[in-house]
Amino acid sequence: GKVYGRCELAAAMKRMGLDNYRGYSLGNWVCAAKFESNFNTGATNRNTDGSTDYGILQINSRWWCNDGRTPGSKNLCHIPCSALLSSDITASVNCAKKIVSDGDGMNAWVAWRKHCKGTDVNVWIRGCRL
C-alpha cells in the first residue's frame, strides 16, 4: 500500500469532493484516516466478528465490501475489498461517501469518534496548499 503524506491526502480528498461532504470538513476526513490507518492505503485489521477493515479509512467487510470470507457480507458499496487497498483512494472515498450518508455520519468510524470528534480538526490541514 501507499502511505500518504498529510497534505497529499488532504489534496486528494478535496479533489474527490470530501471537503464538507455531508457537512464534514476536510480536516475530519484527514484526522479519521490518520487514526484509522496512519495514512496507509494497505492497512488491514481483522475484527473479532470475523470481518476485516480495509484501507486508508478502514472500511468493513461485513457491510461495505466483499472479501469472500465474511459470512453474511452485504457489500453495500458493490466492490471487492481489495479495491480499498489501492494507492488510488477513489474506491475508498466513494464508499466512504455512502457510509457517511447512511444515517450515523462519521460516527461510523470508531477512531473518528475517539480522536477527532469535538476537536479542532483544522490542525490536520494546516499549512497545506489546497
Swiss-Prot record:
Q: Gene symbol?
A: LYZ
Taxonomic source organism: Phasianus versicolor
A GO term for molecular function: lysozyme activity
Q: Which CDD domains match?
A: LYZ_C (cd16897)
This protein's name: Lysozyme C
Enzyme Commission number, as recorded: 3.2.1.17
- Active-site residues, as the UniProt record annotates them: E36, D53
Q: Name one GO cellular component term.
A: extracellular region
What subcellular compartments does it reside in? Answer: Secreted
